[in-house]
A protein has these predicted regions:
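CBM-like, beta-strand-rich accessory domains located in the C-terminal region of large
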Residues: 1-2, 19, 32, 100-285
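Carbohydrate-active enzyme catalytic cores, enriched for enzymes
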Residues: 1-94, 150, 262
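A generic structural motif
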Residues: 67, 99-100
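Short glycine-rich loop/turn motifs that provide flexible caps or phosphate-binding loops at active sites
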Residues: 89, 97, 122
């Protein structure tokens, strides 16, 4: 997910400020916003990466909001625009499929595809046209990136046009809202016509998932999490197992939670990840 050479900034944000606007012209800037005498948020501009890093309580989000590769070197790109990683209590919950090979073939094609990342796919297309072993053709373009922080949490949102080649020219809007209690991800696909919209959540190795009735229960070393999905059209919620990189030249299996919607655009879906309450502790109270 994190590849060098992206033409955007990494912003490191913690909760508490009203609005954060990093200075894109600065280099190595560390900006501190203060509220009522206390440090409210810190924004750190690092080397260009196209990533936003947000932290709230024990939740840690890394969102891919930059171009897939430099315009001068369309290579080593993955079709992963608006993919994200999530850790809770420093334990991976949502992970990246990773890279296990540079050899041409189905494994390399899958690991670079939109379907291999925690983002939205439209009509089985990739958000960036990846071909060969390294190259990229038509690329997703991100616009409208905004980051807001407040007393309750952090919101990051943007839109990309990586599916503009499809009939109806779909646009993918994504908003992450992170608090110390939960992560809410709102996806909106606008455009014209009937399309298949698929949202995938790539779970970390060792994480189990059960799905039924539009909800899912995810169990990881960090605990149990409920996943609820609300959408503007009927959702088919399924789980599957797919190979992910365990190292260069090796793979292992991990679970994927998939939300599939077939409907006329616009399509809106909201996915909420929250920690399950300790039922036994409640019974003792």
């Amino acid at each position: 997910m994190a590849r060098t050479g992206k033409a955007a900034l990494i912003w490191q944000i913690s909760t508490g400020a009203s609005v954060v606007r990093p200075n894109p012209a600065a280099t190595g800037l560390v900006s501190t916003v203060r509220s009522k005498g206390a440090v409210a948020a810190m924004v750190t501009e690092k080397a260009p990466t196209g990533l936003v890093r947000a932290m709230a309580g024990s939740w840690h989000l890394l969102a891919d909001v930059g171009p897939p590769c430099p315009p001068s070197l369309p290579a080593h790109a993955h079709a992963d625009t608006f993919g994200c990683l999530v850790h809770v209590d420093k334990v991976p919950l949502l992970a990246d499929t990773g890279t296990s090979t540079y050899e041409p073939g189905p494994v390399r094609r899958h690991e670079r595809s939109t379907a291999a990342h925690s983002t939205v796919q439209v009509d089985a297309a990739d958000s960036t046209e990846v071909w060969g072993v390294f190259r990229a053709g038509r690329r997703a373009r991100v616009d409208g990136l905004t980051v807001h922080t407040g007393p309750s949490g952090i919101t990051c949102e943007a839109v990309h046009d990586g599916f503009r080649c499809l009939p109806g020219r779909p646009l993918h809007h994504r908003r992450w809202s992170l608090t110390s209690d939960e992560l809410e991800v709102e996806d909106l696909v606008t455009g014209r016509g009937w399309h298949e919209v698929v949202i995938r959540w790539q779970l970390a190795v060792g994480t189990a998932v059960r799905a039924a009735d539009g909800m899912a229960l995810v169990t990881s070393p960090a605990g149990a999490f409920s996943v609820t999905i609300g959408a503007s059209a009927p959702v088919l919620l399924t789980t599957e197992t797919r190979p992910v990189a365990a190292g260069f030249g090796s793979t292992t299996d991990a679970s994927v939670l998939t939300c599939r919607i077939n409907a006329a655009l616009p399509v809106r879906a909201t996915t909420v990840w929250s920690r399950e309450r300790d039922r036994s502790a409640e019974g003792e109270m």
